[in-house]
Amino acid sequence: MVVAGMTLTTGLSALQGDPVEAEEALPLPARDGRVVLYVMDQPDLGLTDDMAPHIDQINYAFALLEGGEADGSHWQGIRQLEGYLARHGHIDGVLSVGGWGAEGFSDACATAEGRKRLADSILRLMDRYGFTGVDIDWEYPGSSAAGIKSREEDVDNWYALLALLRQGLDQRQTERGRDYLLSVALGAGAEQLAMVDGERLGGLVDQAVVMAYDLQGFDRITGHHAGLYPAGDTPNSGAFAVNALTDSGLFAGKILLGIPAYGRVWRQVSGDNDGLHQRAATAGNRTLRYDELQQLESQGYTRHDDEEAQATWWLGCGNFVSGEDEASLTAKADWLRENGLLGAAVWAQHQDPGGALLMTLSGALAPSPVADGD
């Protein structure tokens, strides 16, 4: 990491002996919550210096599992990340492992020897590239979602893996005198939430990212894919997921509300009820980036608010589009502040080129001004 006014070597630069010049610290806006940004590995990460004050933590996605160990040999943008973190020393760099459809967790964690091998490899990869934390994104223990292998013992093995990582991170903290964090990504559906013992999980992790998106979109009935509150006949929502976790004993101050930087599109939708909860010709499989959502009204779409769900949608050209805008982001920022959450986690940078959603969210988390006399 970088301290203003000092020249440090870290991660790849340290390995290759190239010094990194630290810049003067940028002014950081005050926020009532932590902003975590998932950055997917690709040749151009799309990170600009003007985004940096709005980011507290980058989760670099993803290390994959090969032969029972964490592997980053496929990474193309790691040098860019190194440089970015070196220039902006206030940002924590966290290694995310797994992701949707990532195979190998169940087999690797099936035995004590396998779990130790995997945990040790994750920590080695973290150390090699100068990350200061680990985010485990196993989607999902005990489930064959996306066709991955699973077994009945996965949930217990997941906790056991987290315990080994916690032990290794704590040991590094003692030896090196700095904090190392452990995070998990959690599904927001009832089936995924049922596997979580919040009290047990809270004793192991510093952060839990609730992936409160893709809640709808896999059938032909339109709806909010990332609504804050339930709507229609489905309970799935960000608030539902967070409340389920806190009810199970997870401290709200460890929870990050997941926010999508993309919308979902259903095609050939009737105008009844302004398109909401209507049958479409397609499922909501097509996605639009945040900057594309911002252009919809100029293309003839009409924007609508669902006050019950605190969600936004657009209807136009026969299409129904569910996604975020300033109003829905502000509602989520207000809610997570009022409920004592740690903050928000945005998936993902490549869907928010230029950082408009990131900056809007950061602004929405700014402390409310104190009125005279308060």
Regions found by a protein language model. Give the residues of each.
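Conserved beta-strand positions
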Residues: Y60, F131, I136, V184, ...
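Non-cysteine beta-strand/loop elements that form the S-adenosyl-L-methionine
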Residues: Q57-A63, S96, D137-E139, Q207-Q216
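Glycan-binding loop/region signatures in secreted carbohydrate-active enzymes
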Residues: V97, I259-W335, L361-D374
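Short, well-ordered coil/turn segments that N-cap beta-strands
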Residues: R31-G33, D56, G89-G93, G130-T132, ...
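Conserved, mostly hydrophobic/aromatic
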Residues: I58, L95, I136, L165, ...
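Glycan-recognition patch characteristic of GH18 chitinases/ENGases
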Residues: E21-D127, S143, E153, L164, ...
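Short acidic, glycine/proline-enriched helix-loop-strand junctions
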Residues: A145, K149-W158, D305-D306, P353-D374
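Substrate-binding surface in catalytic domains of secreted glycosidases
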Residues: V36, G67-Q76, D120, P141-L293
